[in-house]
Amino acid sequence: MRLSEFYSPTVKNVSSDVVSASHKYSIRAGIVSQTASGIYTLLPLGLMVLRKVENIIREEINAVGFSEILMPTMQPADLWKESQRYDSYGQELIRIHDRGGREMVLGPTHEEVVTDLVRSSLKSYRDLPVNLYQIQWKFRDELRPRNGILRSREFLMMDAYSFDTDFEKAMKTYDAVFRAYRKAFKRMNLQTIALKADMGAIGGSVSHEFHVLTPTGESTVYYDERALELSEMNDYGIEELKEVYAATDDMHDEKSCGIAPEDLKTARGIEVGHIFYLDDRYSRTMNVKFCNTDGHSGTHVKMGCYGIGISRLIGALIEVFHDDAGIKWPLSVAPFKVGIVNLFSKNEECKRVSERIHSVLPNDSLYDDRDDTPGVKLSRMDLIGLPWQVIVGNSFIKDGVLELKNRATGDIELLSVDDVVSRISV
């Protein structure tokens, strides 16, 4: 992609009320543009990152046996009244009326809709398990939206729902999703810590949150050192988690945690995922039953629900991967693999070499062919944060070599054109 043909409005300065790094760089690098308080337009670079995050999550959730659906954003208020959440959910729930006066809500979550969907076809234990997920926009009327896409009023979420015959099977599903989350976050180079969490407005009896630890996180988390060691393992489940202490602020109890004060760690974290075992919280209030192996038809299905904030993850990634110059995207989620910076756009030989490099990865490289000063071009590419930069500049004019810069480390290698082509083609 040529930068001259690509909509990428970078911004030099942001408002003084923009505090977090993710908010600042998401605006400055042209990832998002603010439409209103807590409402953002995803720009081309941001949408490319979003799609990569989305696909990683989709692949891992598919791998544990979930089927993708797409439920409506607008939901009948009657379903929320049936589940007894319409009044208790609070002012975050956006309530509207259609032209016929029927009460509707804009979905902040979809437990009611998916439960209604499954009960329409569920008859026997033979119809279970049912594992469904969607990737859909959610709406919450946040009182104080802040930190850009980390806490906005409209956000993209993967929400999954499981329906099982009994507790044991439901917890196997819960554990499978727990492991899928771990794999998805690792693929994004994010180290997450799993914490015992409050059930909140969703309800249920077991809950875990996944947090990325960063000094600028919104939440306080408590854990012992073994929880961090566990988070570095390639694979672990909820059974292993029982052996360590890790809790959100809402669930932490210093007296009963069993950890000596000198061994208890505290940190700030950004919540990026949440899973719940719901038991029969919704199947009982919405009367979702099935006929079991004994022929008894009064058994309530056991449910779980699982959420990952996809657009929120973009903010979390920027919080973790940035420096004073801008963003440093991990390769797995970067909008492009390589940025090509031609510092002398009017030099025919520099132009020819830049075109050759671009032809190697036409869909995975961003070629800065604009007629700007070298300083502007280099600063812009650092701000955007692509994993690799190929710089066609003085080194090429003098010695015929290119600069290959690793954005994450800042290391620069001087390589021949052929060697650069070989390196970026891998």
UniProtKB/Swiss-Prot annotation:
<dbReference type="InterPro" id="IPR006195">
    <property type="entry name" value="aa-tRNA-synth_II"/>
</dbReference>
<keyword id="KW-0030">Aminoacyl-tRNA synthetase</keyword>
<dbReference type="GO" id="GO:0004827">
    <property type="term" value="F:proline-tRNA ligase activity"/>
</dbReference>
<dbReference type="InterPro" id="IPR045864">
    <property type="entry name" value="aa-tRNA-synth_II/BPL/LPL"/>
</dbReference>
<dbReference type="InterPro" id="IPR050062">
    <property type="entry name" value="Pro-tRNA_synthetase"/>
</dbReference>
<dbReference type="GO" id="GO:0006433">
    <property type="term" value="P:prolyl-tRNA aminoacylation"/>
</dbReference>
<dbReference type="Pfam" id="PF03129">
    <property type="entry name" value="HGTP_anticodon"/>
</dbReference>
<protein>
    <recommendedName>
        <fullName>Proline--tRNA ligase</fullName>
        <ecNumber>6.1.1.15</ecNumber>
    </recommendedName>
</protein>
<dbReference type="InterPro" id="IPR004154">
    <property type="entry name" value="Anticodon-bd"/>
</dbReference>
<keyword id="KW-0067">ATP-binding</keyword>
<comment type="subunit">
    <text>Homodimer.</text>
</comment>
<dbReference type="InterPro" id="IPR002314">
    <property type="entry name" value="aa-tRNA-synt_IIb"/>
</dbReference>
<dbReference type="InterPro" id="IPR044140">
    <property type="entry name" value="ProRS_anticodon_short"/>
</dbReference>
<dbReference type="GO" id="GO:0005829">
    <property type="term" value="C:cytosol"/>
</dbReference>
<keyword id="KW-0436">Ligase</keyword>
<dbReference type="GO" id="GO:0005524">
    <property type="term" value="F:ATP binding"/>
</dbReference>
<keyword id="KW-0963">Cytoplasm</keyword>
<comment type="function">
    <text>Catalyzes the attachment of proline to tRNA(Pro) in a two-step reaction: proline is first activated by ATP to form Pro-AMP and then transferred to the acceptor end of tRNA(Pro).</text>
</comment>
<dbReference type="InterPro" id="IPR036621">
    <property type="entry name" value="Anticodon-bd_dom_sf"/>
</dbReference>
<keyword id="KW-0648">Protein biosynthesis</keyword>
<dbReference type="InterPro" id="IPR004500">
    <property type="entry name" value="Pro-tRNA-synth_IIa_bac-type"/>
</dbReference>
<dbReference type="InterPro" id="IPR033730">
    <property type="entry name" value="ProRS_core_prok"/>
</dbReference>
<dbReference type="InterPro" id="IPR002316">
    <property type="entry name" value="Pro-tRNA-ligase_IIa"/>
</dbReference>
<keyword id="KW-0547">Nucleotide-binding</keyword>
<dbReference type="InterPro" id="IPR023716">
    <property type="entry name" value="Prolyl-tRNA_ligase_IIa_type2"/>
</dbReference>
<dbReference type="Pfam" id="PF00587">
    <property type="entry name" value="tRNA-synt_2b"/>
</dbReference>
<comment type="similarity">
    <text>Belongs to the class-II aminoacyl-tRNA synthetase family. ProS type 2 subfamily.</text>
</comment>
